[in-house]
Amino acid sequence: MIDLKVLRENPDAVRASQLARGEDPGLVDALADADTARRAAISAADNLRAEQKSASRLVGKASPEERPALLAAAKELADKVRAAESAQAEAEKAYSAAHMAISNVIIDGVPAGGEDDFVVLDTVGEPTALTDPKDHLELGESLGLIDMERGAKVSGSRFYFLTGFGALLQLGLFQLAVRTATENGFTLVIPPVLVRPEIMSGTGFLGAHADEVYRVEADDLYLVGTSEVPLAGYHSGEILDLSEGPKRYAGWSSCFRREAGSYGKDTRGIIRVHQFDKVEGFVYCRPEEAEAEHDRLLGWQRQMLGLIEVPYRVIDIAAGDLGSSAARKFDCEAWVPTQQTYRELTSTSNCTTFQARRLGVRYRDENGKPQTAATLNGTLATTRWLVAILENHQQPDGSVRIPEALVPYVGTEVLTPKN
């Protein structure tokens, strides 16, 4: 949820953010009206309760002659209190709905526009020049790494098996990510992949894209699409000690996405699938530290991409392509030779205080007063990285060279086709 102080002091900034996102600026006025109505309802109920308390004292002191009239007035006042409390509850409900409807306020400098309006911040390496390159699936099948056919037989479309060196390659990639994270002060966490509705909602994943989330209706739980969700919920309702700096976690988990809005897109291979694995960095910090921490997350992502030796670019995502929780997001996209384009391998989002406010995550400031924390997240490795590794490191004979940093984990320098 956005900070109401920002809404009250600078509603134009919130309207501008909504417009940049391509969302309804009228929601800002609706929230302002709901906030005013809620505060009025609270005040009215408080005043009536105070009046009721005074009336009760009068009844206790009243003479027998005065008592009947005072009791009748007290009963009438009790009815008014009940009505006022009911009105307050309705006002609170309307306010909460209006508050939840507004996306996070974007940070100054975020590009306006939609999916294609990103800004390229940096490009690293030259696109790999290959003659008649094979795509990752052809390579994966010839090397015995990926089995889509049996994945579909067992689970349906967009499922797969990673086998042999394919499994070792992913495991090695994740071990490298964990080593990178822990060397930089992250605590490794293997979180649950089923979460309660309030945690999924608190992170902003039950809004416009709720149809992308798998739900286990019998237990009223949701399968996570990223360990960002359980890690955001990890400290929900808590007051953190951030006096020694940010709290950084690296979550290793399986992730699940329905891809409901992706019909017909990336149907070949493992670029867009229903289940994959990921190591996700997650940070709690003071709001004033968030932008610097965002840059650090991006730096660790770039370090990982350097270790797997693929050409990539860094882009600043436009406001209309941001999730509701993100105030700014950077993506790192790797070159995919067979598609002759860059594809997303990482994203890192600065969610400012948006998620923490929903989830009740706070810290104590220098005066000991509880304040809302900021949260950030960023990919450190995921299954999709295998696409970039296989395609960029393929050799003319159909083999694939393993990046030097992964050789100790995979156990070989070259993967060769099976006969």
UniProtKB/Swiss-Prot annotation:
Origin species: Mycolicibacterium vanbaalenii (strain DSM 7251 / JCM 13017 / BCRC 16820 / KCTC 9966 / NRRL B-24157 / PYR-1)
Q: Which cysteines are joined by disulfide bonds?
A: none
Stated role: Catalyzes the attachment of serine to tRNA(Ser). Is also able to aminoacylate tRNA(Sec) with serine, to form the misacylated tRNA L-seryl-tRNA(Sec), which will be further converted into selenocysteinyl-tRNA(Sec).
Top-level class of the enzyme under EC nomenclature: ligase
One Pfam family from the UniProt entry? tRNA-synt_2b
Q: Which family does it belong to?
A: Belongs to the class-II aminoacyl-tRNA synthetase family. Type-1 seryl-tRNA synthetase subfamily.
Tell me what this protein is called: Serine--tRNA ligase
- Key word rRNA-binding present in the record? no
> Where along the chain is ATP bound?
257-259, 273, 344-347
Protein's GO biological process? selenocysteine biosynthetic process; seryl-tRNA aminoacylation
